[in-house]
Amino acid sequence: MVLLKEYRVILPVSVDEYQVGQLYSVAEASKNETGGGEGVEVLVNEPYEKDDGEKGQYTHKIYHLQSKVPTFVRMLAPEGALNIHEKAWNAYPYCRTVITNEYMKEDFLIKIETWHKPDLGTQENVHKLEPEAWKHVEAIYIDIADRSQVLSKDYKAEEDPAKFKSVKTGRGPLGPNWKQELVNQKDCPYMCAYKLVTVKFKWWGLQNKVENFIHKQEKRLFTNFHRQLFCWLDKWVDLTMDDIRRMEEETKRQLDEMRQKDPVKGMTADD
């Protein structure tokens, strides 16, 4: 049994802008989660092309997670089992990410399939699932300006879209009705990231607990990440994809150094 949910994240940026903003924010957020032997290690970051014509950027990363999983898993899992591998195929505006664990092999899987569409999250079944499968998928809307969707320990005033105003674009702050107002603002673009998340965790006695925990953490991650992405708008809105590739090279070097020298930091599990 696997647990499927679709998270819909609406943003006041265009689909083209988001391509740069997402990659910039992934690089920055990785630094905030890396230190004390934990965090992100980038193994591969290179273009790919498949036989069917799909092409884009392929990345393979290892996440060293010791303090970022619940205590009940830490107590049961042997040393080294808390590293997960993330392989991503970014054929923007479609992206596919597969997360696995060498210790659990085929008993553990997180798959995130994302379509980026120029709408307000109104499309049903953008991932073209079979009707019977789609019937069982829960659609969850993430509002980046809703303070109640953010854990108090994750909240940062400088990463609050309800307070941020972009100097370069004039966008923000986002009020309680910002999504409805977007429709009438002809000068402000918008888009939705439709994130279909499949979670499989086969471990007798823990399956439901861990699958629900993973979905809770994915929602938390998507919420915090997209709040940051919008509040960092002025840092990335003028960048090109060439700028991003140069930045990713530098970030890889920094992450290797930070993992060895910095203290543990970033998001930890809610036990």
Swiss-Prot record:
Q: Where in the cell is it found?
A: Cytoplasm; Nucleus
What are the entry keywords? Acetylation, Cytoplasm, Lipid transport, Lipid-binding, Nucleus, Transport
Which reactions is this enzyme annotated as catalysing? a 1,2-diacyl-sn-glycero-3-phosphocholine(in) = a 1,2-diacyl-sn-glycero-3-phosphocholine(out); a 1,2-diacyl-sn-glycero-3-phospho-(1D-myo-inositol)(in) = a 1,2-diacyl-sn-glycero-3-phospho-(1D-myo-inositol)(out)
SUPFAM superfamilies according to UniProt: Bet v1-like (SSF55961)
> Quick check: keyword NAD in the entry?
no
The residue ranges flagged as biased composition, category Basic and acidic residues, are: 251-264
Q: Which residues bind a 1,2-diacyl-sn-glycero-3-phospho-(1D-myo-inositol)?
A: 59, 61, 86, 90, 97, 195
Cysteines joined through disulfide linkages: none
Query: Which Gene Ontology MF annotations are present?
Result: lipid binding; phosphatidylcholine binding; phosphatidylcholine transfer activity; phosphatidylinositol binding; phosphatidylinositol transfer activity; phospholipid binding
What GO CC terms are in its UniProt record? cytoplasm; cytosol; membrane; myelin sheath; nucleus
Region Disordered, annotated ranges: 251-271
Q: Which residues carry this modification: N6-acetyllysine?
A: 216
Principal location listed in the UniProt entry: cytoplasm
Q: Please provide the Gene Ontology terms (biological process) for this protein.
A: axonogenesis
Report the PTM annotation. Phosphorylated by PKC in a calcium and phosphatidylserine-dependent manner.
Which disorder is recorded?
Defects in Pitpna are the cause of the vibrator phenotype which is characterized by early-onset progressive action tremor, degeneration of brain stem and spinal cord neurons, and juvenile death. The mutation is due to the insertion of an intracisternal A particle retrotransposon in intron 4 which results in a 5-fold reduction in protein levels.
Similarity comment: Belongs to the PtdIns transfer protein family. PI transfer class I subfamily.
Xref: PANTHER family = PHOSPHATIDYLINOSITOL TRANSFER PROTEIN, PHOSPHATIDYLINOSITOL TRANSFER PROTEIN ALPHA ISOFORM
Functional summary from the UniProt entry: Catalyzes the transfer of phosphatidylinositol (PI) and phosphatidylcholine (PC) between membranes. Shows a preference for PI and PC containing shorter saturated or monosaturated acyl chains at the sn-1 and sn-2 positions. Preference order for PC is C16:1 > C16:0 > C18:1 > C18:0 > C20:4 and for PI is C16:1 > C16:0 > C18:1 > C18:0 > C20:4 > C20:3.
Protein name according to UniProt: Phosphatidylinositol transfer protein alpha isoform
